Amino acid sequence: MRIKVDEKSDALYIRLDESPIVESEEIQPGIILDYNDKNQAVGIEILGIKKRIPLEELKKLQFETI
């Protein structure tokens, strides 16, 4: 899994899987899911991230491997 914050685009992208993306669907305004050819979600894009989560809070994210 990879997480990318693009400050210029004001977007957060979470890549769950490296399989090719064949379809994308906006499930809510500004939230887009990417799917592979097996209809599995492989990516999540959140637009307008600065309005949803303050940038300073994003920088504090902690990750846990389970």
Q: Can you name each region flagged by the protein language model?
A:
Residues M1-K4, I44-I46:
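Short low-complexity stretches enriched in small and charged residues
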Residues R2-I3, E7, L12-E26:
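Structured beta-strand/loop patches that form or line metal/cofactor-binding pockets in enzymes
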Residues E7, Y35-N36:
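Short, acidic, Ser/Thr-enriched surface-loop or helix-capping motifs
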Residues G30-L33:
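Hydrophobic/aromatic beta-strand elements that line small-molecule binding cavities or substrate pockets
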Residues K38-T65:
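C-terminal structural segments of small proteins and small subunits
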Residues S9, Q28, E56-L58:
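Short connector loops at helix/strand junctions that flank enzyme active sites
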